């Protein structure tokens, strides 16, 4: 399911300010306010699928982030990554060659959609799934970036 369909929206700005993390899940088509969101962010994660269709929108999003004047670092998360897929590897190599930092490559896993449908994390749904370790590594990377920002 789409990310925005499985999480709750916080409409209370005072409560949001007390939270350790705030997630802004934008639509697939960028809308107004993106520059403000970028400037307010500590860290920006841009998800993409390893496909030629996602390359142009991902690069366009990264350009918008750069042009926003934010001080936040921006990283790409490659979802549905297949390590043995030629196109998957070539796209990652291209991005890295262009200096685009990739914070995580999350592998394909049926457990992701099943966990979302069940309303639980993939670690709760299937703790032995091969996707749990990369997601934990992503979470650790986000926490490390937050420590750098606050440390």
Q: How would you label these PLM feature ranges?
A:
Residues 1-35, 116-124:
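P-loop/Walker-type NTP enzyme "switch/lid" segment
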Residues 24, 46, 76-78:
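Structural beta-sheet core signal
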